[in-house]
Each structure stands twice: as C-alpha cells, then as structure tokens.
Amino acid sequence: METVNVNLGKRSYPIYAGPGILQDLGELLGGLPVGRKVLLISNPTVFSLYGEKAAESLARAGFTVAVAEIGDGEEHKTLATAGRLYDRAFEAGLDRRSSIVALGGGVVGDVAGFVAATYMRGISFVQVPTTLLAQVDSSVGGKVAVNHPRGKNIIGAFYQPRLVLADVDTLKTLPVRQMRSGLAEVIKYGVIWSREFFAWLEQNIEALLNGEAGALAYAVRESCRIKAQVVEQDETEQGLRAVLNYGHTVGHAVEALTHYRVYTHGEAVGIGMAVEAGLAVALGMLKRSEGGRIIRLIRQAGLPEGLPEGLPPEKTVEKFYHDKKAVEGQLTFVLPERIGRAVVKNGLAKNFLLEFLSAGYGLLERGAGRV
C-alpha cells in the first residue's frame, strides 16, 4: 500500500493506493477521532461486488454501519437524491461525530460528499473510489456537488475527505468502456503537469488497457500525486487549480448537449482535450507536433476525439457560457502550451470560436488526429 499525502493544514488527509486494501478500511477510519456510526453509500452494482467486504471491515473495527444505495449515472446526481440520503442519515441516528463513506464511482462520491458537507453543517467523509476515473480524479481534492437542470455540478462545495482509499483490485470488475473513460483523466495529468508521465503513458497505454496491476497502481499513484500538488497550492480554484479543467469546458458542453446519455464523463473529456488541443494549435500556443502526440494518445486509449456529428457550433458555444469557469460573460479555457504545461486562457471571442468549430476546429483534422 502506497500513501500520497494531501497537505492542507488542518484539512490534510492521506490517499492510500494499492491492491487488496479495501479490507483495511475499518482499521484506517478507526485510527481517526470519529464516532462509531457510519452511513455507507453505494450503488447496487458496486455494493453487490464490494459492499459486504467494506461493511465487514468497518464492523470489525467497531463501527455500526447503515447502508444507502443510490442509482448510477448523472441523472441520479440531484437534490432529490441528496434529500433521500438525509432521511437515511436521520433514520440511522448519525450525529456530528458520525461518518459517511462513499463506495463507488464519481456519482456516488459527489453526492455522498455533498450530503456529508451539508448534513449537520458537515460530518466526516471518506472516499472509497471503485472506478479508475474516481480513483485518479473525483475522489481527490474535495469537490462535491449535485447537478441542476441548468448545469452540471452547479450546487456544491469544497469539502475535503478524511481519507481516500483506492483499491486497484476493484478495477478488475470495471467494464472496458469505464476503464477507457478513466484514462482520459490520467492523460490529462500528463498534458497539464508532467511531460515524463505523459511519455510513460505513451509507452504503457496497452498495459493499462489490459488491466496490469503494476501499471494501474503506478498510474493511480502518480495521478493522485499530481492532483495533490495542484490542490495544495490552490484548494478552492482561485487560480492554478483551474488547469485541472483541461478538456472540461468542451467536455461539459458535449455532455449537456447530448443530455448525459451518449458519452461517459471521461469520453466527453477526451473529446474536450482533443478539441482544446486543436484550439491551442489554432491560437499558435501549441506546436502541431505536440498536439499530434496528445491526439494520438487519446485515440490509443480508445476515446472519441471529435465532436458529435450534427452538433451546431452555435449551441456548443452557447453552452460554454454556462460553464462555471465563465466569469462576467468571459469564456475561460485551459489550453496546453506544451506537453507538461497548461495555462488558463480568458476572453476568447465568440466569433473566433464559431469559426473554429465550423471549420472542423481549425488545424485539427476531425478523426485523423493530424495537427
């Protein structure tokens, strides 16, 4: 078991990563000054696979465990779902010293974290992510939220977990599509932060797709290490942390315009990273050769790289204005300057973006990856 620490003063916490560590959940939580009541939140699929092991580990450590299940998918990430979880927390007798444990992917973690942040003004929260995307991204950094009909993650908070436990053995049961989806966020870290990690991914993408435990453990640990470094410097996204949104301005627009029914989050981010790499090339910020490497790796991961056919540029750009990063009508994109470094770009003109998208995003050839 490897440990990555997120150093945030009184809100610091460890990320434990490795194979076969779910059985240690109770012992690790028991080492913290928390009460003995726990609400374990999961979805039916994950709970059927790992719920009993997690609950038994908590019970062995002296915790009284109540269970709540929520549906899987973005359509369940709502205030209505949160309301049902508040009811379950009251029924289970949770008080201000109790804990909520999220066992599942990003939706479970986001909703459970939002409930933990707001129940009795905040109780202890533990992330036990079981998808690659959640292990490398959504479980780390304290972003918790539910969706609103007008936008994704509009209702939320920054609320750090007490610990994160990422057992890479849970990835063995992950469908191939979800594994590829998680790789989008892994690739993101290489593009925005570490040229060396990006090069490692180019050499090891097949091993990751084949589920090789050693490669997965390294990718999870390195991704968490990079995200921890960013979060430590900018916990509440006032500046630097915005680079973690590379691929997400376009990605969120794609998700919304396809009603969250066509693409997984990671697939949408893959499209976003490809389009935004093309945008960086069109602006003269990124070398065409570097853009080509980014597109090739996205394709090798089995992720989509082009906007959906028939998606009107006008509607796409309009969705950009609903993005949380847009401030006072100014659009904000995170664009790579080179592999290993990304910057925040503000104030791109609407007409330029319309031209860019209408032309098949400029210097980026749709579906070809030649930039």
From Swiss-Prot:
**E.C. number:** 4.2.3.4
| Residues holding NAD(+) | 72-77, 106-110, 130-131, 143, 152, 170-173
Give the subcellular location.
Answer: Cytoplasm
Per the record, the pathway is:
Metabolic intermediate biosynthesis; chorismate biosynthesis; chorismate from D-erythrose 4-phosphate and phosphoenolpyruvate: step 2/7
Q: Which domain of life is it from?
A: Bacteria
Q: Which UniProt keywords apply?
A: Amino-acid biosynthesis, Aromatic amino acid biosynthesis, Cobalt, Cytoplasm, Lyase, Metal-binding, NAD, Nucleotide-binding, Zinc
Q: How is the cofactor bound?
A: Binds 1 divalent metal cation per subunit. Can use either Co(2+) or Zn(2+).
Q: What is this protein's function?
A: Catalyzes the conversion of 3-deoxy-D-arabino-heptulosonate 7-phosphate (DAHP) to dehydroquinate (DHQ).
Name the PANTHER family on file. 3-DEHYDROQUINATE SYNTHASE, 3-DEHYDROQUINATE SYNTHASE, CHLOROPLASTIC
Q: Which family does it belong to?
A: Belongs to the sugar phosphate cyclases superfamily. Dehydroquinate synthase family.
Which NCBIfam families did the record assign? aroB
Query: What is the protein name given in its UniProt record?
Result: 3-dehydroquinate synthase
